[in-house]
């Protein structure tokens, strides 16, 4: 990652902030990948998605995609620092030093200060999964993106985060003018993992267009085939995209809209970002 410590901004309170890089530098600076207003980030022990709220793009200085990317970027940096400190500690209780929720709070505070110094507005959801050795997975969520753990031996989800809304189609979100904060509303789910378990994190474009049973069916077939994780993610995206583009299709989003008395039909056209990861034992580890 390119070091940008020599170029910083001041937020007026004497706090030195990292600067937003130029377009040419951005690819080398930010952790993760942007997909529309969504962003994703991944490593060998953590994965995460964020869904920038697109309505901000119609406002002056609104930038939904930047908010989602910054939240994941700073969360990844803080998480890596927590893991580094834990690994260098003499304590046997490694997990007590690692908190994806506190890392998200730190990211939220940094992103808020940085964007405010440039008068950039926006909000985003965030959904994260972090593996702490030997086999503890922490799922952390704010908003309507979701994380799931699928156990092939049982053919079902054994854990999941719940969607969070203020009201229909208005998720809890982090950023400009939102009362939500990670420590205030963040949801944490702890899972004891087994080898072969599959973790999925996805923005709402997936589960707004596919029912849980459809996703489980796809995952079951994929697990039996032994195919690559990337192929499963692509399969889920393509299936959700097909429903999203069908104005007469049946979808969970349509069902929820009808329950609210809204005459909405078909799928929900949206950015769709999915990460699929499999829990595997490292070589040489008992």
What are these regions (language model features)?
Residues 1-286:
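PP2C/PPM-type serine/threonine phosphatase catalytic domain
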């Amino acid at each position: 990652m390119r070091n940008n410590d020599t170029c910083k901004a001041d937020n007026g309170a004497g706090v030195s902030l990292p600067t937003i890089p130029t377009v040419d530098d951005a690819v080398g600076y930010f952790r993760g990948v942007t997909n529309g207003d969504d962003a994703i980030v991944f490593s060998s022990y953590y994965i995460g998605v964020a869904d920038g709220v697109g309505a901000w793009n119609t406002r002056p200085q609104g930038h939904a995609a930047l908010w989602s990317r910054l939240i994941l970027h700073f969360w990844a940096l803080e998480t890596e620092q927590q893991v580094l400190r834990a690994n260098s500690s003499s304590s046997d209780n490694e997990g007590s030093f690692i908190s994806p929720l506190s890392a998200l709070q730190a990211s939220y505070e940094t992103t808020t200060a940085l964007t405010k110094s440039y008068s950039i507005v926006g909000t985003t959801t965030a959904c994260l999964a972090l593996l702490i050795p030997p086999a503890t997975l922490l799922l952390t969520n704010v908003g309507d993106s979701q994380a799931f753990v699928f156990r092939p031996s049982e053919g079902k989800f054994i854990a999941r985060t719940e969607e969070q809304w203020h009201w229909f189609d208005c998720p809890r979100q982090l950023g400009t003018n939102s009362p939500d904060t990670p420590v205030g509303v963040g949801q944490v789910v702890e899972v004891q993992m087994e080898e072969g378990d599959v973790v999925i994190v996805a923005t709402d474009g997936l589960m707004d267009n596919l029912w849980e049973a459809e996703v489980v069916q796809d995952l079951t077939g994929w697990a039996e085939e032994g195919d690559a994780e990337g192929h499963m993610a692509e399969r889920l995206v393509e299936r959700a995209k097909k429903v999203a583009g069908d104005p007469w299709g049946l979808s969970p989003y349509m069902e929820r809209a009808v329950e609210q008395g809204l005459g909405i039909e078909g799928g929900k056209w949206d950015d769709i970002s999915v990460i699929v990861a499999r829990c595997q034992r490292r070589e040489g580890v008992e």
